[in-house]
A protein has these predicted regions:
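Short, surface-exposed amphipathic charged segments that create phosphate/polyanion-binding patches used
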Residues: 128-136
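Active-site-proximal alpha-helix that buttresses catalytic centers in soluble enzyme cores
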Residues: 26-118, 123-126, 167-185, 190-193
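Bacterial N-terminal signal peptides
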Residues: 10-19
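Bacterial N-terminal signal peptides that target proteins for export
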Residues: 1-10
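Sec/Tat signal peptide C-region and signal peptidase I cleavage site
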Residues: 20-24
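Generic beta-sheet signal
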Residues: 39-41, 150-156
Length: 193
């Protein structure tokens, strides 16, 4: 008879194989190379904000009713900004979800003027309409794809990034999205990532 520990071990091994295969299929790009692409967007998921979703009394204009960055999230935001600054990158505008954790991430990155944009809001728990949000974002993306400029920078939520890029992201993770080629690449902030 096989022990329960051995059964559990094999269960986890079998479950992890598809994830390792998917990770192996994911393509990466350095931040330096990502910043040299034109007509693209760099999406960043907001930095670490412990918890899940938002409280039931959520109001977009009241940070006290939202899940917010903790100290690690604030440090992570600054580290992301430092990676951009180490490459002498600055932009006129960083587009951000109106959620406080996204706005704070964008401000702490400190690489450009932060502009709140409803097309980056989270529709995870129905606080905003998914279709309306993605239509606003799609309209914004269509104006970006034809410009011959460095990537637009957008700070948003897992559900928004996944809806556009088909990739799941961790807190503070960046994705380069090539609008013309409908291609997504995970960004390595440093050579050690």
């Amino acid at each position: 008879m096989v022990s329960k520990h051995r059964q559990l071990f094999w269960f986890f091994v079998i479950c992890m194989v598809p994830f390792q295969f998917l990770e192996a299929q994911t393509q990466f790009i350095s931040l330096k190379d990502a910043l040299e692409t034109r007509g693209t967007v760099i999406f960043f998921r907001h930095a670490l904000a412990p918890g899940y979703g938002d409280p039931t009394n959520f109001q977009v204009d009241d940070c006290a009713t939202q899940r917010n960055l903790d100290q690690r999230g604030r440090e992570q935001s600054k580290q992301i900004g430092d990676a951009f600054k180490s490459l002498d990158f600055a932009t006129d505008t960083v587009h951000s979800s109106p959620w406080c954790r996204c706005l704070e991430t964008a401000r702490l990155m400190d690489i450009g003027e932060v502009e709140s944009f409803e097309g980056l809001g989270s529709f995870f728990e129905g606080h905003v309409d998914r279709q309306v949000t993605l239509k606003l974002l799609s309209d914004k993306l269509s104006t970006i794809s034809n410009r011959d400029e460095s990537p637009a920078i957008m700070i948003t939520h897992q559900v928004v990034i996944s809806a556009i890029t088909k990739l799941v992201t961790s807190s503070g993770e960046g994705i380069l999205y090539d609008l013309k080629g409908d291609r997504s690449l995970r960004i390595r902030l440093t050579e050690n990532d």
